[in-house]
Amino acid sequence: MPATRLDGKKIAAEIRSEVAADVETFVSGGNPPPQLAAVLVGEDPASQVYVRNKERACAKAGIASRLDRMPAATTQAELLAKVAELNADPAVSGILVQLPLPSKANGGTGIDERAVLDAIDPIKDVDAFSPVNVGLLMQGRPRFLPCTPHGIVQLLHRTGIETSGKHVVVVGRSDIVGKPMAMMLAQKDSTCGPAVANATVTIAHSRTSNLAEICRQADILIAAVGRPEMITAEMIQPGAVVIDVGINRVGDKLVGDVAFDEAEAVASAITPVPGGVGPLTIAMLLHNTLMAAKMQAASN
């Protein structure tokens, strides 16, 4: 029996609808609409698509959006000055700098991404990348949760999949997905309650020598490594839940980090690519932007 396909599009639509209703209530209370400011450096086609998708999602949720375009030749000092400008603008609720920044090979100036992300005011850091917000997450008292891991927690919760007492294997150790995902699931509680926390978590990565063996131990396998169809059926325990975070272009189609067709025959539930985790990332970005606006309104 093939696995249940976990419909990220449907759940993301539910979350966006909830955010839109909350925005309406927030604005009707005399507050200005939340505003998300995106900074796009260079002309990377994929980044431009992502930014357009975010703008459209903001508009549907009643969130104002602002896009600051900067040339690929922008210097680090110029980009830091732009971030400082947005930090100081009271109309801006949330700030995101679209990654990746242009490499020198693509006309960039070698900007230190970490320095730029560190410069964003933590109360406007809706991607939750700043050291302050990462530290709060580590302590179990997060201000904002990283969008993709939080979207996965919402997906698990809203489809009735519990992680408490389960062995979760996260393949990938990025600061954006792998590390925060592991930390969130290992906590005693979550935004969705303790049933979507309290996991025993293993982080695997490209240097893990016995990767297939470790993956086969997972009750829930989360693939976030950025390698097309790296996770094959023989790496999946029969009946496991498989969450595929990867988005990779192979020829004229998008594929995940999981070999979907063969994995679907082994797993009990699986996210497709596209239409799985991706839509949830933007939905949680809207959620974080509204949260930021509420916190800033309360502090004024």
Swiss-Prot record:
Q: In which pathway does it act?
A: One-carbon metabolism; tetrahydrofolate interconversion
Q: Which InterPro entries match?
A: Aminoacid_DH-like_N_sf (IPR046346), NAD(P)-bd_dom_sf (IPR036291), THF_DH/CycHdrlase (IPR000672), THF_DH/CycHdrlase_cat_dom (IPR020630), THF_DH/CycHdrlase_CS (IPR020867), THF_DH/CycHdrlase_NAD-bd_dom (IPR020631)
Name the chain's protein.
Bifunctional protein FolD
Instruction: Enumerate the UniProt keywords alphabetically.
Output: Amino-acid biosynthesis, Histidine biosynthesis, Hydrolase, Methionine biosynthesis, Multifunctional enzyme, NADP, One-carbon metabolism, Oxidoreductase, Purine biosynthesis
Family the UniProt entry places it in: Belongs to the tetrahydrofolate dehydrogenase/cyclohydrolase family.
Give its E.C. classification number: 1.5.1.5, 3.5.4.9
Enumerate the GO terms in the molecular function aspect.
methenyltetrahydrofolate cyclohydrolase activity; methylenetetrahydrofolate dehydrogenase (NADP+) activity
The terms describing its cellular component in GO are:
cytosol
Q: Which reaction does it catalyse?
A: (6R)-5,10-methylene-5,6,7,8-tetrahydrofolate + NADP(+) = (6R)-5,10-methenyltetrahydrofolate + NADPH; (6R)-5,10-methenyltetrahydrofolate + H2O = (6R)-10-formyltetrahydrofolate + H(+)
For this protein, the record's NCBIfam families field holds: PRK14186.1
What SUPFAM superfamilies does this protein map onto?
A: Aminoacid dehydrogenase-like, N-terminal domain, NAD(P)-binding Rossmann-fold domains
Residues binding NADP(+)? G172, R173, S174, S206, I247
**Role according to the record:** Catalyzes the oxidation of 5,10-methylenetetrahydrofolate to 5,10-methenyltetrahydrofolate and then the hydrolysis of 5,10-methenyltetrahydrofolate to 10-formyltetrahydrofolate.
Q: Does the keyword Amino-acid biosynthesis apply?
A: yes
Q: Cite the Gene3D superfamilies for this sequence.
A: Leucine Dehydrogenase, chain A, domain 1 (3.40.50.10860), NAD(P)-binding Rossmann-like Domain (3.40.50.720)
Q: Which Pfam families match?
A: THF_DHG_CYH, THF_DHG_CYH_C
Q: Name one GO biological process term.
A: L-histidine biosynthetic process
**Gene of this entry:** folD
Tell me how this protein assembles.
Homodimer.
